[in-house]
Amino acid sequence: MKPEISDDLSRRIFLRGAMGVSLFATSGCEKIEDFLGMEPQEGPVVPPSGEGVDLVSHVLNRLTFGPDPSEYARVKGLGVDDESAVAFFLEEQLSPNEIEDKRTQRAVRRLEAIHAPLGELYEYKEDHLLEQLTRATLIRATRSKRQLFEVMVHFWSDHFNIDISKKECRWLKVADDREVVRKHAMGNFSALLKASALSPAMLWYLDGRENRKSGESEKPNENYARELLELHTLGVGGGYTQKDVMEVARCLSGWTVRGKDRFFKGKVEFHADAHDDGAKVVLGNEIASGGGRKDLDDILEIVGMHPSTARFLGRKLCIRFISDDPSEASIKKVAGTFLSSNGNIKETLRAVFATQEFLQGSRAQKLKRPFEFIVSALRGVRARVSSEMDVVDYLIRMGHAPFQYPTPDGYPDIASPWTGTLLWRWHFAIALARNEVSENIKVEEEVLIEKAGGVDGLAASLLGRNPSIEEKAAIERSGEPLALLMASPGFQWK
């Protein structure tokens, strides 16, 4: 059962209606729709205070796609107190290859298309590839025990965004997800950056394959060079000029993607005769003439470990894990670790999680993006899911379908762009609680309440804190505690 809703909903409804005003303010109502049907109120975006959210719930909300009751209990038992338990959990998640995850791997292994070698991807219809890649993404986010790894896969997928609908990306993005993002998500940034630069999908998406020099008067295609500096490394205001963009484009000329050979279609090749082999100067660094394919390595070394790159990535990681407006102290600490560790992603993450702002000052201050909201709901209520694709319609309506963001900057990671998703979040919460999403997704509300020791326990499990007196009263009046809790402000923020 899929609810109907207008496509032209105001993008301001969500934060005005759900965040600025408590959903629990309505009185005298008996139906859940009455609680959620109030008029949106004007006012600033105000997240919950985060007061009462315990450390384990906070860490699980940030490092995973939302806690499920069994995982919360497991993590609580890892130490003599919450601090030691969280420390153990952090180290556990920073070593994903040591975490047994056979159940998830078996489920993903059945999706044969996403495991196909590069040249064989063209044997599949593009819609089939998108479906299998999306299904694998949802399975991993929902079921995997390697949760931080999956969160970082999403982070890098946005950082090195590729819209799967663009030309050959419809086939090649599958290989990019497998060989670039997932392979290097918790490794070294320099290796990730080079893998992305030589990704067939990226060469198609940002026109790198068209960057060639065939005559003295021909200018290089600068599309990828510009995004490399602006989005992948230094960032806006990172100290580069238009001249640097052109020089980087010259360094990267000559790389292309084979298109005709059946078995090698999609293979990346370097054509020396299409490369600008003259001397270049990038960010004050001289690159000698005659470098050929080595020019790519030289330029990536210059920009990959640049102080501006460290700050740009440090800020993005702090935004992802701490708040939409992280402190300068946190950014500097993370950027410093990035440089001192030579781009080691695990060490950089340790620096993020060691900041006092992460540990103490940011609880319930990050709005869940639609993908995070839906997956956290499925995990939080331990839904039995036999077809993850049945939630994709909701993701499309909320504007957060995987691999379908049209511009290179990737899906935004702050609250304000997601202001138009309130009604669809409500629809999903109600449908999930009532077992109306689809016949392939089932929730047992009474069992959840019983295992939680009552409705208050269920509320504590989903909100990460004990419910307030007002919340308890509203839940009792609604008659549908699970739907109300998942639609409440406390469940929208993490």
Regions found by a protein language model. Name each.
Residues 37-43, 48-52, 57-70, 306, ...:
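Flexible, low-complexity segments enriched for small/polar residues
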Residues 169-382:
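Active-site substrate-binding loop specific to GH73 endo-beta-N-acetylglucosaminidase modules
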